[in-house]
């Protein structure tokens, strides 16, 4: 019964065309960006037409896919990186840049949205793992290949790093050569910390070791007393006493115990034993407080795990609600509701034609349903015009 009240068709769909004044390369770039937006509604625009970020969570691990479009895109392939660095067969050795064949073989006719979707599908099929000892952020010490220096990462949750020198090298400090090789076997190399702010101007501490003190495996040393080349007290002994000392070990040991150097060693040993016992008693006194703090850390870690799980569930719920309230979803609901109102009005008209309804009841109910139908159609057309207008300026609804 739509012939009773013909509906006017909106001509707003023509407004979605490409804006004038753009070259074919720029139009292709906009089409690829639109493909990326349409394929992934949760993508965030960091810098218009330059940088985009897509977060996703897998196995309680949240990963940000950063998509950087070079100036000559799509003639140049995009630079796709992830943070934090991960281990996966589609990533490079550092776990930062995507080396997928779809990215390496990118052409201006490729579909960027499908490339990112295939990357996500591969991550879901073969979940990645965090890269070990990943302290450096992408682009910290060197520019990636194929990326111009004009673009910045602009991550809001990290402090900005100052520009690094291109020829900067990271060297490790070594202790003095007098340290035995056994000491180095018990030490592990520490990753170089990134320098930023005023900390880069501070001097690094250089460990020093006294070459005159032999060092043991635990890093502590003891300076032995100087042993003289001659013992003047032996000159006061007779030949028979010297002979007895040479032949009898007890006499030699008795004379040896009277040496001041040995007495000094015994005194130092006793002092060291006393200091060790005192330190052990202090450590035992600290045990209850350390155990309490350890339990507190465990409780807070458990609370952190629970809050993280709750946060991820709420983020998933927020994403679902955001999808349900998007412009395309609202437009679909309006279209269905308008169609339902139109069907109800058609049924009322058929009942009237069959004589099942009085004319007064027909006019009131039929006009009410048709008014609702026309209102919903008008809202749908207005929403379509708004979507077409915003799509020209690349602003996602």
Curated annotation (Swiss-Prot):
Cell compartment(s), UniProt: Late endosome membrane; Nucleus
Keyword list, A-Z: Disease variant, Endosome, Hereditary spastic paraplegia, Membrane, Neurodegeneration, Nucleus, Phosphoprotein, Protein transport, Transport
Record domain VPS37 C-terminal: where: 308-397
GO CC annotation: centrosome; cytosol; endosome membrane; ESCRT I complex; intracellular membrane-bounded organelle; late endosome membrane; nucleoplasm
Region (Disordered): 1-22
Example of a GO biological process term: protein transport to vacuole involved in ubiquitin-dependent protein catabolic process via the multivesicular body sorting pathway
Tissue specificity statement from the Swiss-Prot or TrEMBL entry: Widely expressed. Examined tissues include heart, brain, placenta, liver, skeletal muscle, kidney and pancreas. More abundant in liver. Strongly decreased or undetected in hepatomas.
Keyword Transport set for record: yes
InterPro entries named in the record: ESCRT_assembly_dom (IPR037202), Helix_hairpin_bin_sf (IPR029012), Mod_r (IPR009851), UBQ-conjugating_enzyme/RWD (IPR016135)
Chain positions with Phosphoserine modification: 18
A family per Pfam: Mod_r
SUPFAM superfamilies linked: Endosomal sorting complex assembly domain, UBC-like
Domain of life: Eukaryota
Membrane topology, record value: Peripheral membrane protein
Associated clinical condition: Spastic paraplegia 53, autosomal recessive: A form of spastic paraplegia, a neurodegenerative disorder characterized by a slow, gradual, progressive weakness and spasticity of the lower limbs. Rate of progression and the severity of symptoms are quite variable. Initial symptoms may include difficulty with balance, weakness and stiffness in the legs, muscle spasms, and dragging the toes when walking.
Assembly with partners or alone: Component of the ESCRT-I complex (endosomal sorting complex required for transport I) which consists of TSG101, VPS28, a VPS37 protein (VPS37A to -D) and MVB12A or MVB12B in a 1:1:1:1 stoichiometry. Interacts with TSG101, VPS28 and HGS. Component of an ESCRT-I complex (endosomal sorting complex required for transport I) which consists of TSG101, VPS28, VPS37A and UBAP1 in a 1:1:1:1 stoichiometry.
Protein name, UniProt field: Vacuolar protein sorting-associated protein 37A
Classification lineage: Eukaryota, Metazoa, Chordata, Craniata, Vertebrata
